[in-house]
Amino acid sequence: MVKEKKKADKKGEKSARSPSSLSDNLDFSKQDGNTTRQEMSPAGVPLLGMQLNEVKPKKDRQNVQQNEDATQYEESILTKLIVESYEGEKVRGLYEGEGFAAFQGGCTYRGMFSEGLMHGQGTYIWADGLKYEGDFVKNVPMNHGVYTWPDGSMYEGEVVNGMRNGFGMFKCSTQPVSYIGHWCNGKRHGKGSIYYNQEGTCWYEGDWVQNIKKGWGIRCYKSGNIYEGQWEDNMRHGEGRMRWLTTNEEYTGRWERGIQNGFGTHTWFLKRIRSSQYPLRNEYIGEFVNGYRHGRGKFYYASGAMYDGEWVSNKKHGMGRLTFKNGRVYEGAFSNDHIAGFPDLEVEFISCLDLSSGVAPRLSRSAELIRKLDGSESHSVLGSSIELDLNLLLDMYPETVQPEEKKQVEYAVLRNITELRRIYSFYSSLGCGHSLDNTFLMTKLHFWRFLKDCKFHHHKLTLADMDRILSANNDIPVEEIHSPFTTILLRTFLNYLLHLAYHIYHEEFQKRSPSLFLCFTKLMTENIRPNAFQIKGNLFREQQRTLYSMSYMNKCWEIYLAYCRPSAAPPHEPTMKMRHFLWMLKDFKMINKELTAATFMEVIAEDNRFIYDGIDSNFEPELVFLEFFEALLSFAFICVTDQMTKSYTNVPADDVSGNKHETIYTILNQDAQNKSPSAVMSHESDAAHSDSARSSSSKLELSPDVNKIRKSEPKIKKSVSHERVSKMNFKLTGKGITFFSSESKKYERPKDDREEEFNTWVNNMYVFFVNTLFHAYKREEAIKEKIRADRLRSTAQAQQRKMEDDELEARLNIFILREEEAKRHDYEVDITVLKEPADVSSSHLILDPPKEDVTVSPSSKTITSKKKKK
């Protein structure tokens, strides 16, 4: 028996230990919602300073911490136990099969044994009441199990070496706290969701690192306010979006330790009735420092006015540019939220921006300046809110008739203003989801649809021609003349109609007066009234299909730009002709027996009778993006057969139900992020409200700025509920969160014919755009990239060969020069050698006379010597 005790003690329980408290560090962080936001707008924007009510009192925090400390189980206490008694089977003296063991100190185990070890299903109860039910592997709690604490708290999920590790859920009994997600070594780590109340209205879902909120996550506070973005050390830190539903405000941008810091966008939503006079929101886009507007930034007012300049502690201070609601501009210095030099200008300034101040305007020496700037001294019958820009049109008439022309056309606009407002509101809402403040802003895409519905293009003008006409009077970058994301205010919409009316009908009324009035009246009579509200094309006909089609819009815009070419007409902006469109489809290998060139022409000419009459075709007209995109939607039904859709009938349910649909404003914001900072900042008040008109979206949307916005947005990560498959589910009840295990329910497709038709349409769209068009574009771009790489490689190789040839040639030249130098040197040596004998002989010839004496004397000596001998 002693031997059994030692074996059970040494082998069995040295590594098993109870986990630490699952409620440790529940993180009722002060940064979750009590940051006071000092966001008072000097122009009557509601006060932002408020405390969110999600933070627990300090006393509660202490109680929670005490409860946490009271349930810490970090020590390995099983190694101190000795088996006192055992009931069950034995094999060769070792515990085997099902049995019950009691240990010294009061701990017990009931379950399966194998070779003397706790192995298999079992229940271990500590002396203090903590209970573990689940799997054991050689005396160690492993795989799946349930911990139950004496106070009623419980954990169910994966266990590794006695620690919570993997996926599991925890529910605290002393506090209304529940967590479901991933664990590592007994701590929340990975993706998980924590609920702070029984109702499930206060929660956090996202990334955890060692019990700390860190990474990407969504925090919903008890008040309903929501933060979505990056976290660091339990605080909002990085890129994120906060929506204050209680005050109808939203901030998207940079955070540092729970406070707005860096570049961001703050929007104030105002509830309005339908057909409100002002379709915009009060919005600030710029730099923040410690929650204040500080640095460079733009403030867009709901009236259409805009301030672009420097800010200091929420006040305009420094150089700035103020655009009034009528389009007039003041540019100069500001001091302490006033125009420099006019310290008593504040009340008039607020009044002229149509922001309620609660104080009646008072006269001052600056009133005359304001009347000139905001147009209140103007005698226009349209009032100061709308000022028609007729300078270019009036220049076409003699100066003597210009006042009468202007007056009569203003009367004409005034008579039709109600109908024009209704038209503007109707078309600007196409393709848009729910608006938080019941307002919509027209984009160029909506405007094109209006022009085609009213048959403006039947007057020998394409939509591209109209864009060029309308851009002549605006400082619009060349690459944005045909952008579908350009926004259009009501006053801009009216100005556009007047300019187009003149270009279409001026020849007919050039000899009659008032000519401009007659042009506009005929435009209203023959084009607008009979045809407005009758939506043609296949993009905006049905709301649900429109929202789904928008999900493909950004990629199609990218493809459209890739195949545009400079226009032949000034200012030579990039456009796409019909022949370019057809060539593109041919390159994509999409021209086949289903989609022939003739079918292509029929689809394009369906809304334009001047392109194709059944015999002759005109491939020269330019296509704007609306025509390009609607043609692709039509091609989807032609190219995709029933056999192709059969293999794609299981489109995700979220796509079918519309949960992932994008509105035109969501796409507009995404497009603005892709623009260069210079392009974005160059917009004036009529074209720079891309972000201000967006509807609520589940995606993190950031506004761009020079050297401020990060190039990479945090990616929207999958929620924990999407990751667990047939593991653990939970539901909200009146008493809190109930956890249960079940199989995932399969999505059942409704049997209704209308739903079936819509599902078929969705499948067609998916097959055509994702599997056909986008795949072909990707393949073509890969080929082009390979060609470019090959060309670069060939160029580099040619340059390398040229360098090698040049080097070889240089070496040969050097060798030849050296050879020539050597030959020349040898030649000089030979010449020197040849010259030396000649020099010697010549020297001998010169010295001959003296040598004659020398030659004679020896002979005389010999003669004399002979005489002496004799």
UniProtKB/Swiss-Prot annotation:
It comes from the Eukaryota. GO terms for cellular component: 9+2 motile cilium; cilium; cytoplasm; cytoskeleton; sperm flagellum. It is found in: Cytoplasm, Cytoskeleton, Cilium axoneme; Cell projection, Cilium; Cell projection, Cilium, Flagellum. Residues 784-811 form a coiled coil. MORN repeats lie at residues 86-108, 109-131, 132-154, 155-177, 179-201, 204-226, 227-249, 251-273, 284-306, 307-329. May function as part of the axonemal radial spoke complex 3 (RS3). Radial spoke complexes are important for ciliary motility. This is Radial spoke head 10 homolog B. It comes from Homo sapiens.
